């Protein structure tokens, strides 16, 4: 059976902790989307870890940790995390990497930085991890899958073609140094050495595991409100954050995802720009930020202070509905123990109209009938 652990809100709901708990009884843990742009914080007997690409099940010797085809795989970051985990006494995790996973290229990170610089005050608050440029290339069909590392002639030919296009942008739009094909090729050959022992047909592996009755856990990143289709667009991430995408990003049949655990925390937080109805400011926000999370509410990837707010029932109801929740894990209620009363947002007042729906346009009769 497959269970998915996903977020109801903007991310940072505590999915890592819930995944870590459920991993104790799982055989396989799969990352199926996203990349190193968001982190899951785990605290256990080995210490405190902020995992950006490694699945949260790496601390259990009986599990296999899998990178699915839907992941934006930053190979150096992945193996840096792997080595850090092992250096702290964790037994070397069993890992597998999909041959269809696409790689975050060095220039994706550069383009992410350059575009944020170009946009200035109109930027999206990117973590500068290369995620948007990565997915742009993936859907423009000029990305690089892991399996392409093993055909060096075709790889170099494709790399030269892609660099020609990228260099036009670097020269005329960003006014930055051009890419060197030989240097990039040499770097990709280092990537090949790193991943070679772990590459497999993950979809086939997971389908065989299901036939054997194995317990599989899909670990999602961020939350519903960051989904590119159903989130608060355009302040979203570039890959689907919904449990439904687990079937695509892991390569399993949709009907096998029988449990969807949606994680929501007792207050709200967000990293980056965008609408945040229940947001609080000043000393009120600072106190909640200090008390929250594991050592405070700061981004696991960027270290930036998270924007803080009270629990948003409207957004959370929407998030759970879109995820198809079969179960809800409610986290960090203990953090709010310093309050006499816990503020909660139960509806939105939009120009005098009260609504309990997360709306992008004016409500129609059909919208209100279904609220």
PLM feature spans:
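Basic, polar low-complexity surface loops/patches
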Residues: 1-98, 102-105, 329
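A glycine- and small/hydrophobic-rich beta-loop-beta segment
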Residues: 249-347, 355-359
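Internal alpha/beta core interface subdomains
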Residues: 78, 82-205, 216
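General beta-strand structural signal in soluble alpha/beta enzymes
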Residues: 5-7, 29-33, 51, 95-99, ...
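A glycine- and small-aliphatic-rich helix-loop capping segment at beta-alpha/alpha-beta transitions
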Residues: 21-26, 47-50, 111-119, 140-147, ...
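Catalytic or ion-translocation cores adjacent to nucleophile or general acid/base/metal-coordination motifs
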Residues: 26, 30-34, 236-262
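Conserved phosphate/anionic-ligand binding catalytic regions in large, soluble enzymes, centered on
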Residues: 6-18, 125-140, 215-250, 268-271, ...
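Conserved small/polar residues in nucleotide/adenosyl-binding loops
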Residues: 360-367
């Amino acid at each position: 059976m497959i269970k998915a652990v996903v977020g109801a809100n903007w991310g940072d709901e505590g999915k890592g902790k819930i995944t870590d708990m459920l991993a104790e009884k799982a055989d396989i843990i799969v990352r199926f989307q996203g990349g190193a742009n968001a982190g899951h914080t785990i605290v256990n007997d080995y210490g405190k870890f902020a995992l950006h690409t490694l699945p949260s099940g790496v601390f259990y010797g009986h599990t296999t940790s899998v990178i699915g085809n839907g992941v934006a795989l930053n190979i150096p970051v992945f193996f840096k995390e792997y080595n850090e985990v092992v250096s702290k006494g964790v037994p070397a995790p069993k890992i597998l990497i999909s041959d269809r996973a696409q790689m975050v290229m060095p220039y994706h990170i550069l383009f992410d930085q350059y575009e944020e610089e170009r946009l200035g005050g109109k930027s999206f608050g990117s973590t500068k991890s290369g995620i948007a440029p990565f997915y742009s290339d993936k859907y423009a069909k000029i990305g690089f899958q892991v399996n392409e590392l093993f055909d060096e002639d075709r790889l170099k030919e494709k790399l030269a073609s892609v660099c020609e296009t990228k260099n036009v942008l670097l020269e005329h739009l960003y006014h930055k140094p051009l890419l060197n094909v030989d240097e990039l090729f040499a770097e990709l050959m280092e990537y090949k050495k790193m991943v070679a022992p772990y590459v497999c047909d993950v979809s086939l592996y997971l389908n065989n595991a299901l036939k054997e009755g194995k317990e599989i856990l899909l670990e999602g990143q961020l939350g519903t409100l960051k989904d590119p289709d159903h989130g608060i667009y355009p302040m979203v991430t570039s890959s689907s954050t919904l449990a439904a995408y687990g079937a695509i990003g892991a390569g399993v049949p949709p009907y096998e995802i029988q449990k969807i655990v949606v994680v929501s925390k007792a207050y709200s937080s967000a990293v980056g720009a965008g609408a945040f109805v229940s947001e609080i400011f000043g000393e009120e926000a600072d106190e909640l930020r200090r008390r929250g999370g594991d050592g405070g509410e700061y981004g696991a990837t960027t270290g930036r202070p998270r924007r803080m707010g009270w629990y948003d029932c409207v957004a959370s109801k929407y998030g759970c509905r879109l995820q198809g929740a079969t179960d809800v894990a409610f986290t960090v209620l203990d953090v709010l123990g310093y309050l006499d009363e816990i503020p909660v947002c139960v509806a939105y007042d939009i120009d005098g109209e009260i609504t309990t729906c997360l709306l992008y346009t004016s409500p129609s009769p059909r919208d209100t009938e279904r609220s």
